[in-house]
Every structure is written in structure tokens, then in C-alpha cells.
Regions:
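Bacterial lipoprotein signal-peptidase II cleavage site
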Residues: 24-35
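A conserved helix-loop-strand patch within extracytoplasmic ligand-binding domains
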Residues: 120-169, 272
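Periplasmic-binding protein-like
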Residues: 156-164, 265-287
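Short, polar/charged alpha-helical segment
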Residues: 46-76, 85, 89
Length: 297
């Protein structure tokens, strides 16, 4: 027969066993699916992108893609109208990335500012073109014809290089692709009048001159397709690699793994299809390492 102490031990053992069984059968506090959702939400990282015009449209589209969600990213697109302000915002970490500029423009910004920015990745090249409502070919330009070009730093230099590529002028051998101006023209056989203007006045001025050099964004806003409407446009080769557009970040964040994912998103197939459908082939995809650009300096 069991004594009193042994009976108590047996009762406690049975009680503990029942406790384990009941605990094992109890309902979990949160279903596994809910926990997974919580983990996914926690892992999603918001990246702010400063952009403008057609670039902003592209990034708003990218923000909706399943590839963006799969990368664990949420893109917040901020609209800007001032180019310098977009670079300043990136340099000061007020936004994470900006999307609007060529590599040449980025270099020019860094030369003029203390807080530096850096290319994160390449995106596309938009050829700059020469447009005219008065002539249909380069050969038709008369002596003394006036050609309007952008007056803003790197774009002015780029326009002059385009005129040289077209055979209309010749520039000095050490022409600066960032700071070059019309003063650097050493040969101008047709005595062309090169007129730097503010691009904000381009639409008004277009019919007042014999021709105008436009970047693709302004051309598209005016209903022009550089591949169809320009009488001449930039070749896509080693001579124009500085004109490739880039995503820009603060210099210290150039190798940020989260931001690198943003650069990769631009080159997914569905983005290429969207760009082709909406911009008539005028934004030519360039998926090159950043080193491809820096070697061009």
C-alpha cells in the first residue's frame, strides 16, 4: 500500500502530465501566415526617389511592380522641378536617390559643389538632337544661320559636341565636356551663329531660329521624337558615354546594398516594355557598370 507521501507524488505527476497535454492542444497565439505577413512588412524598406517629368513617370510605374515588392522595397517618388535642388537633396540625405541626369551633368555638379554625389547605376541614353522647321538636312544650312543651344553647363558642352559630330563646327582639341562653350569653336565654315539660350524658352524660340538643339525630355514635351523628327542626333558610341543617364546617391552611399537593388529594378523586362511603349524608343536602355562611365573621364 502507498503511504501518504507516495500518493501525493503520484497525484502531482498525473496533474503535470495533464498540463503538458492540455498545453500541447491549446490554440497558437498567432497563425503562421500572420507571422509571415508581419515579418514581410518589417523587412520592407522605403526608398525615396527625387525625379521629374518622364523619369518620375517611369519610377511611379516601377513602384507598382511585383519585382519591387519581391526585392523588399517600397518606392516613394518625390516630384521636383529644379535639377540642382534634386542633387542637393541627395547630397544632404533628404532623399535616397535621384533619377533625372546624365553622368556629365553629375560631374559638373560635383565640380561646382562641396557635398559630392555619385552614380549608383546606369539607366538609359536619350540622344540629343538638332531640330529645324526651316531645313530638312544639314547641308541646307545657309551661311550665317542661327542655331540655338542650351546655356546650362554640361548641356551646352554636349550640344557643341553634337554640332561637331554633325560636321557643322570644329572644337579645340582639349575641349572640356563639362565647361566647354562656343568660345572653344576653332572652325565654323558657314559662320553659323551659335546662340546659347535658357531651355525654358525653347518652345518660343524654336521657330525664331534656323535650328535648335534639344535634349530628349524637352523634345518629347514638344511632341517631337528624336529618332524621327531630328535632322541629326547623337550617335550611341564611346564618344557619347558621358551622356548616359544615371541614378545618383550621396557619395557615402554608392555601395549601399539596399540602394543597389533600386538600380537593378530599372532593367527588369517589364520596365523595358513600359519605356518602349510610352517613349517611342527614345530612351535606349544602358545596363553597364559604373566603372564604364568613370573610365571616360
Amino acid at each position: 500500500m502507498l503511504n501518504r507521501e507516495e500518493k501525493m507524488k503520484k497525484i502531482l505527476g498525473i496533474a503535470l502530465g495533464l498540463s503538458v497535454v492540455l498545453t500541447g492542444c491549446s490554440k497558437p497565439e498567432a497563425p503562421a501566415a500572420d507571422a509571415a505577413k508581419t515579418d514581410t512588412a518589417a523587412a520592407e524598406q522605403t526608398v525615396t526617389i527625387a525625379s521629374t517629368g518622364s523619369d518620375a513617370d517611369i519610377w511611379r510605374h516601377i513602384a507598382t511592380l511585383p519585382e519591387t515588392k519581391a526585392a523588399g522595397l517600397k518606392l516613394d517618388i518625390k516630384n521636383f522641378t529644379d535639377y540642382v535642388a534634386m542633387n542637393t537633396a541627395v547630397a544632404n540625405n533628404e532623399v535616397d536617390v535621384n533619377a533625372f541626369q546624365s553622368y556629365a551633368y553629375l560631374v559638373a555638379y560635383n565640380e561646382a559643389n562641396t557635398a559630392k554625389i555619385a552614380p549608383l547605376s546606369t539607366t538609359y541614353l536619350e540622344p540629343m538632337g538638332i531640330y529645324s522647321s526651316k531645313v530638312k538636312t544639314l547641308a541646307e544650312f545657309k551661311n550665317g544661320a542661327t542655331i540655338a543651344i542650351p546655356n546650362d553647363g554640361a548641356n551646352e558642352s554636349r550640344a557643341l559636341l553634337l554640332l561637331q559630330s554633325a560636321g557643322l563646327v570644329k572644337l579645340k582639341n582639349d575641349f572640356d565636356f563639362v565647361k566647354g562653350t562656343s568660345k572653344d569653336i576653332v572652325e565654323n565654315n558657314k559662320a553659323l551663329v551659335i546662340k546659347p539660350i535658357q531651355m525654358a524658352t525653347a518652345v518660343r524660340v524654336k521657330d525664331e531660329v534656323d535650328a535648335i538643339v534639344l535634349g530628349n525630355t524637352l523634345a518629347m514635351e514638344g511632341g517631337l521624337n528624336v529618332l524621327k523628327d531630328a535632322i541629326y542626333y547623337e550617335p550611341i558610341d564611346q564618344t557619347t558615354k558621358m551622356n548616359i543617364n544615371v541614378l545618383a546617391v550621396a557619395e557615402a552611399r554608392q555601395n549601399d546594398p539596399v540602394l543597389k537593388k533600386v538600380g537593378e529594378l530599372y532593367h527588369v523586362a517589364s520596365v523595358g516594355k513600359y519605356v518602349q511603349e510610352h517613349f517611342g524608343g527614345t530612351k535606349i536602355d544602358v545596363n553597364k557598370p559604373v566603372s564604364y562611365l568613370t573610365q571616360a573621364k
